[in-house]
Amino acid sequence: MERLATRSSHDDPYSRSSLPTSNAINSNHESNGSTFSYVQSLRRAKATVWSDIGRVAPLHSSPSIKSSSQNGKSSSKGLGGMRSRVFSSQHHGVYHTRPASLHSRTMAPQHTILTPRLSATEGKDDDEDELVISTSNTAPTYISMIESSRASSTHSGTAPSIMGMSIHSRADSRAETTQSDGFESRSGSPTHDIQSYLVNRRSSSSESSDEDSAEEGMKRLVITNMGDNDEFDSD
């Protein structure tokens, strides 16, 4: 009985006695003098390294290979049908890479390619056109009512500019305010009358303050010059 037990232990590769211990591995390293890793030494001793041997073995059998091949064929057919239905570039225009039709305009696709929205800085030209249109549509009436003969005479026969018109309108309003205490309306729009009245008041007050300051400066210069001359005479 003991002989049978020893034989079965030697024949069975999974028995504990067949597995090398750490002492045996160390002794093998010392005796051989080679630098084998732990796994390599276990493989040399024909020991089982714990891996997927139990899972791999049934897959290599003939029935499992047949079933896997059949499953692969059916799955590939299903995937191919799905791809042809969903990812068809001819019917749906789905491009996984940049197609050659986008490089040339003759072969361009029929569907329109959407351009990105322009930012505020890129669309200045469109905004300026819109502003010009809006200003031309909502032009004030008092510009057309200004006498063009005065502007043309001052600009030597050229067309009257907006600056010239504004200057003449201010000059006319100043003359009106200096001649009469009240404000006479020249244009039919009340908003323009109020604006020109306020502008004339501000300009007249600023001009008077400038004139006063200039006169005071001249007086100071005269006084200082006279004082300097007196000092020189006394010397």
UniProtKB/Swiss-Prot annotation:
Q: Where is composition skewed (Low complexity) in this entry?
A: 61-77
- Localization terms from the record: Cytoplasm; Nucleus
Stretches that traverse the bilayer: none
Q: Name one GO biological process term.
A: meiotic cell cycle
Q: Which GO terms describe its cellular component?
A: cytosol; nucleus
Q: Where is region (Disordered) located?
A: 1-34, 58-83, 169-235
Compositional bias per record (Polar residues), positions renumbered to this chain: 15-34, 176-202
List, as start-end ranges, the regions of compositional bias called Basic and acidic residues. Answer: 1-14
The chain residues annotated with the modification Phosphoserine are S180, S187, S189
Q: Does the keyword Phosphoprotein apply?
A: yes
Keyword Nucleus in the entry? The reply is yes
Source taxon at top rank: Eukaryota
Residues bearing Phosphothreonine are T191
Q: Quote the function comment for this protein.
A: Involved in sporulation and has a role in meiosis.
Q: What name appears for this protein in its UniProt entry?
A: Meiotically up-regulated gene 123 protein
Q: Which organism is it from?
A: Schizosaccharomyces pombe (strain 972 / ATCC 24843)
